UniProtKB/Swiss-Prot annotation:
GO terms for molecular function: lipoyl(octanoyl) transferase activity. Catalyzes the transfer of endogenously produced octanoic acid from octanoyl-acyl-carrier-protein onto the lipoyl domains of lipoate-dependent enzymes. Lipoyl-ACP can also act as a substrate although octanoyl-ACP is likely to be the physiological substrate. InterPro entries: aa-tRNA-synth_II/BPL/LPL (IPR045864), BPL_LPL_catalytic (IPR004143), Octanoyltransferase (IPR000544), Octanoyltransferase_CS (IPR020605). It is found in: Cytoplasm. This is Probable octanoyltransferase. The gene is lipB. Substrate binds at residues 66-73, 130-132, 143-145. It comes from Pyrobaculum arsenaticum (strain DSM 13514 / JCM 11321 / PZ6). GO terms for biological process: protein modification process. The keyword Acyltransferase applies. Residues 28-199 form the BPL/LPL catalytic domain.
Length: 212
């Protein structure tokens, strides 16, 4: 598994690259990869989302394959797109994505966690990272966005994941200054470690099932 830092990208370019890599991984002609990027201003809406959660239509809008509802991406967000085979179920993979963010934030002195009623990573009642994936042919893509130091006013263009815009926070709002790509790389590295552990556990369980 390799980690690539793409730098700042337009959403449609990263989306096309991610889908191409997905097809190659699913076909067995490419290794798994984790892409780290930061997008120009854009709004995406997941496959089960509602366009009426986009409150203002001034930014480019893309309806995409991932789960979830309306999300804003832009400068100041560390966006991590793993293109990886599922080691277990979707729920265990989503747990690993969230856990990679939680462990990263802990290194910056931020105590974060989960909520049972909403996906993502939370600090108190505020959302600091959004998660949304798609799975096709056993390979996951799309991923997670961590709010490092984004332009907070743009979240008022949407109801983020169907929630009020005021629910969003960032590392900067919590008093932590950090580099977007350093945060993104740390999330990717933590995720790689977690997925390797899931792979070892899966292999061990399969070996036990083969014992007569």
């Amino acid at each position: 598994m390799r980690i690539f830092i793409l730098g700042r990208t337009k959403y449609q370019e990263a989306w096309a690259l991610m889908k191409r890599i997905h097809d190659e991984v699913a076909s067995g002609v490419s290794e798994e990869m984790i892409l780290v990027t930061e997008h120009d201003h854009v709004i995406t809406v997941g496959r089960h989302g509602r366009l009426n959660n986009v409150l203002r239509r001034e930014l480019p809008i893309y309806v995409v394959e991932r789960g979830g509802d309306a999300t804003y991406h832009g400068p100041g967000q560390a966006v991590v797109y793993p293109v990886v085979r599922l080691r277990g179920g979707v729920r265990s993979y989503l747990w690993a994505l969230e856990e990679a963010v939680i462990r990263t934030l802990d290194k910056y002195g931020i105590s974060a966690g989960r909520r049972e009623d909403h996906r993502g990573v939370w600090v108190g009642g505020k959302k600091i990272a959004s998660v949304g994936i798609a799975v096709e042919r056993g390979v996951a893509y799309h991923g997670v966005a961590v709010y490092v130091n984004p332009h907070m006013e743009y979240f008022y263009h949407i109801n983020p994941c169907g929630l009020p815009p005021s629910v969003i926070t960032s590392m900067r709002q919590l008093g932590v200054e950090a580099d977007v790509f350093e945060v993104g790389y740390a999330v990717a590295a933590n995720l790689e470690t977690l997925l390797q552990r899931q792979e070892r556990l899966k292999t061990r369980c399969e070996s036990l099932r083969r014992i007569p």
